[in-house]
């Protein structure tokens, strides 16, 4: 699945077959032009040892303070940034203020908003987050992904149930594709994964009741 995330921005090209965008083979497009239209959020986004503002402006060097505010508001991270010791001037990264996994993800989403790409790739963007942080990130993504071509690579079904089309891969091959309800009722691999998720959720509720 992550190989696909590398093929779309042409980090390397397919050796057999083709990948098309609006009917055009990606190999016919200039790499710089293609990548300028793509934004990526991975499971562990990188923050440079720099200020929050500088990390955001890597996506748009000329961004104004108001644009930083708007991007962070869209990514549901503005209140967190304002609460930092020096706001947008707070040093983060390797030797700076350590942000939580959910905060880093939402900062990466804010960077995505500033870039304003036509195509968004999310590569396991919520896989390392707890339930509370995942909910905050998904809330941010629901707003940001609206109206864009979005490719979401995920193991967590909660991330993709609202997708226009879900593609199920097994051993590098497509075994199912369709919308959530269709795949859930088809009795295939996706249905098995969904049933497992439902069982896990039921156990969590039972454990919570016992704890109470």
Cite the ranges covered by each PLM segment.
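Conserved catalytic loops of ABC-family nucleotide-binding domains
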Residues: 143-152, 160
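C-terminal portion of ABC ATPase nucleotide-binding domains
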Residues: 83, 139, 156, 161-212
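Hydrophobic anchor residue at the start of the ABC signature
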Residues: 109, 153
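ABC ATPase nucleotide-binding domain helical subdomain, centered on the C-loop/LSGGQ "ABC signature"
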Residues: 18-23, 28, 35, 53-94, ...
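Helix-to-loop junction immediately C-terminal to a conserved catalytic motif
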Residues: 9
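Catalytic Walker B motif of ABC-type/P-loop ATPase nucleotide-binding domains
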Residues: 120-123
